[in-house]
Amino acid sequence: MKQNPLINTNTILQRNPDQLFTMIGDEIVMLDIKHEEYLNMNRHASYIWQQLVTPLTFGELTDHLCSAFDVEKKVCIQDTLDFIAEFIERDIIQIIRE
C-alpha cells in the first residue's frame, strides 16, 4: 500500500464533500468518480468515513478507532495510514492542513 509522507498525528483530514455514497446496513458503498468504480467499504472503513464528517486530526482519528475496535495502537496507525493514503490518492479524503 502507498503511504503519504505528509500525514502525521497533527494532519487534519476530512472527507471530500462532493463524494457520492450510500449506507447499506452498517457499510458504505460509494462511487469513485475519478477511477469510475464502486467501492464497498467494510465496517472499519465505514467507521473512518463517518468520523470524517467533520475534520479530525490523524491522531484523533486513530484514537477513536482504538477506542471503538479492539486493536493495538501501532497496528491501528499503520492500517489507517494505508487506508487514508489510498483514499487521498483517489480524492475521497482530503488533507485540510498538515
Predicted regions and their residues:
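Acidic, low-complexity/disordered tracts enriched in E/D and polar residues
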Residues: 1-46, 50, 96
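Long, charge-rich, low-complexity alpha-helical segments
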Residues: 24, 37-98
